UniProtKB/Swiss-Prot annotation:
Subunit structure, interactors included: Monomer.
Disulfide-bond pairs as recorded: none
GO biological process, one term: regulation of developmental growth
UniProt note: phenotype after gene disruption: Growth retardation, narrow and dark-green leaves with elongated petioles, root growth inhibition and reduced fertility. The double mutant atgk1 and atgk2 is lethal.
Classification lineage: Eukaryota, Viridiplantae, Streptophyta, Embryophyta, Tracheophyta
SMART domains cross-referenced by the UniProt entry: GuKc
Function text: Essential for recycling GMP and indirectly, cGMP. Required for normal development of the gametophyte and embryo, in association with GK1.
Superkingdom of the organism of origin: Eukaryota
PROSITE patterns in the record: GUANYLATE_KINASE_1, GUANYLATE_KINASE_2
SUPFAM superfamilies found in the cross-reference section: Galactose oxidase, central domain (SSF50965), P-loop containing nucleoside triphosphate hydrolases (SSF52540)
Occurrences of domain Guanylate kinase-like (ranges): 137-319
Protein name: Guanylate kinase 2
Length: 389
């Protein structure tokens, strides 16, 4: 047997406040979704704006109501909706009688992205993301010897397409270079702290590289994917091997130098390492290049000789060229029957058409396919339409 949705709310059209127009305690409390110690009440207007659905939070422990910062563009007010609590701090909202580009939404209330935003903003935060069909783009792992130009290529990509790509900020125990900012280039971390976090299972991968510890925390990747951007990881070959073995379905690119002499020249010209460190990095480069070319980890190899040409090849490889649109992934809306019931069955949501003279269409939404997301962004949904008799 399936479970009924957490709740169904009727008549939430614009102008029909249904008890949610109030600043403090909403009157209609049975329409709240309980997650941990907090109830999330979805309805009425967002900060008096009649175009967007509002959210309020009740904390059971403090018995206080708050209006969170709402990230992303949320759904328009609607006739009614079903709300279903999903794992990992998300609420699925399925609207009634809405346009195909406004029918399925996710409210993030306790994801890593939300927790990070809460820390930053110092207040309650939630984020909306719209549900669309299709799969989110795979993260990109870029490896190559030190000084080959990985960081340069990634910076060019992020500068040209800031809304499309996001950088996974690694942790490292090495000291910051003079222009490097904590939390932007790396999370500069004490070795004992990082070792403890590795032990606590917080890292997707880690490795000792040129005498220091480097690692990608699960949260660093989630922060990017939850912001709806395609995640880029700049990691060494050992790290790439670990990611390949993990559940992260990524594409792997290895950047080769035109020659060892050119690699050495670039490292020296960068001027960020001591002579001893340069020698160490060059020694390691040999083994890295061999592993990169022969390990079977990398499906794509780039030669960074001429920077502009290499960048163009990288863009082509990522499906970005002068003819293709670059403002995010092309999205497909979801047409739902005007009148329907919603049932949850394991990781499937069944949306059954109701009403006289209808075709009794059933839409099956596969929750296991959901990834990426928020705020205001899309995530992949796989839908099947079944005709019941
Ligand atoms: N095609 C190129 N031609 C000449 N110089 C380049 C080219 N690509 C990058 N560089 C320069 O080489 C130096 C090293 O590049 P970058 O810092 O991007 O390397 P990296 O692979 O990220 O190194 P690391 O792994 O140590 O972080 C930089 O000074 C950069 O400006
Ligand atoms: N396995 C990992 N390797 C990483 C990570 N972050 C960076 N790196 C690699 O380290 C070297 C040196 O970087 P530098 O900033 O000190 O020059 C470079 O090859 C990076 O790709 C990581 O999280 N995991």
């Amino acid at each position: 047997m399936g479970e009924a949705p957490a709740f169904f709310v009727d008549h939430l059209e614009n102008g029909y406040t249904n008890g949610f127009g109030v600043k403090s305690e909403p009157k209609n409390r049975d329409t709240s979704v309980l997650i941990g110690d907090r109830s999330f009440v979805i309805g009425g207007n967002h900060e008096g704006n009649p175009l967007f659905l509002g959210v309020q939070i009740h904390d059971k422990v403090t018995n206080k109501w708050s209006s969170p910062s709402v990230l992303g563009t949320g759904p328009k007010p609607c006739k009614g909706y079903s709300a279903i609590v999903l794992p990992k701090g998300r609420i699925l909202v399925i609207k009634k009688g809405s346009a195909s580009d406004d029918s399925i939404w996710f409210l993030e209330v306790d994801t890593p992205f939300i927790r990070e935003q809460k820390k930053l903003l110092g207040r309650e935060v939630v984020a909306w993301s719209k549900g669309v069909r299709g799969n989110a783009e795979k993260p990109i792992v870029i490896s190559g010897p030190s000084g080959v130009g990985k960081g340069t290529l990634i910076s060019m990509l992020m500068k040209e397409f800031p809304s499309m790509f996001g950088f996974s900020v690694s942790h490292t125990t090495r000291a910051p270079r003079c222009m490097e900012k904590n939390g932007v280039h790396y999370h500069f971390t004490d070795k004992t702290v990082m070792e403890k976090e590795i032990k606590d299972g917080k890292f997707l991968e880690f490795a000792s590289v040129h005498g220091n510890l480097y690692g990608t925390s699960i949260e660093s990747v989630e922060v990017v994917t939850d912001s709806g951007k395609r995640c880029i990881l700049d990691i060494d070959v050992q790290g790439a091997r670990s990611v390949k073995a993990s559940s992260l379905d990524a594409i792997f690119i290895f950047v080769c130098p035109p020659s060892m002499k050119e690699l050495e020249d670039r490292l020296r010209a960068r001027g960020t390492e001591t002579e001893e460190q340069i020698q160490k990095r060059l020694r390691n480069a040999d083994a890295e290049i061999k592993a990169g070319k022969s390990s079977g980890i990398f499906e794509h190899k780039l030669y960074n000789d001429n920077l502009e040409e290499c960048y163009k090849t990288l863009k082509n490889l990522l499906g970005i060229n002068d003819l293709a649109p670059v403002n995010g992934v092309e999205v497909e809306g979801i047409n739902l029957p005007k009148e329907h019931t919603v049932t949850k069955m394991d990781d499937k949501i069944l949306i059954q058409e109701t009403g006289e003279g209808t075709k009794n269409k059933m839409i099956v939404l596969d929750l296991s396919s959901i990834n990426g997301g928020a705020p205001g962004r899309t995530r992949g949904i796989v839908l099947d339409t079944v005709k019941s008799s």
